[in-house]
Amino acid sequence: MVKNTTILFATLLGLTSLRSIATAEDDLVNPFDHDPAAAATGKKLFISAGCMACHGGNARGAVGPDLTDQEWLRPFSQTMVFRTIQNGRSGTLMSPFKGTLTDEQIWQLVKYLLDEGRKRNAAGE
C-alpha cells in the first residue's frame, strides 16, 4: 500500500510540474505588444523573410492561410502564433524560422499580423 501511495504521489507531482511548464509557455508576452513601430518592422520582416510567397501581400493569404482573418486567428494565442513561426508546422509548407529570425524579430512579425487583423476587422472586412 505504501508503495502504491508513493507511486501515486510521484505521478501527481510529475503532472503538476508539467502543468507549470505548460502554463509558463502559455504566458509568454509579446514585448512589442504596445509598440506601434514594431508593426512596421514586422511588415518589413514579412517581406524580407519571404512570408509573402505563401501568405500574399498584407498577409491575406495565397498558398498559405490568410493571417489577418480574425475568425481564423481567434483560437490562437500570441504564443501559439510565435511558436508556429519559430518552429513551423509539420505536415504543411510552413517552414521553421528559428535560426533564421531572432525571437525579437518573430515577436515583431506577430505584432504586425495582429495589427493587420485588427485593422481589417475595424474596417469591416
Predicted regions and their residues:
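Bacterial N-terminal signal peptides that target proteins for export
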Residues: 1-8
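Gly/Gly-Pro-rich "capping" loops immediately C-terminal to redox-active cysteine motifs
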Residues: 32-43, 56-87, 93, 100
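Axial heme c-ligation environment in periplasmic c-type cytochrome domains
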Residues: 62-66, 87-125
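Electrostatic cytochrome c docking/interface patches
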Residues: 22-47, 123-125
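The canonical Cys-X-X-Cys-His
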Residues: 42, 49-57, 94, 109-113
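Bacterial N-terminal signal peptides
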Residues: 9-17
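A general structural signal for well-ordered secondary-structure junctions
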Residues: 51-52, 73, 91, 119
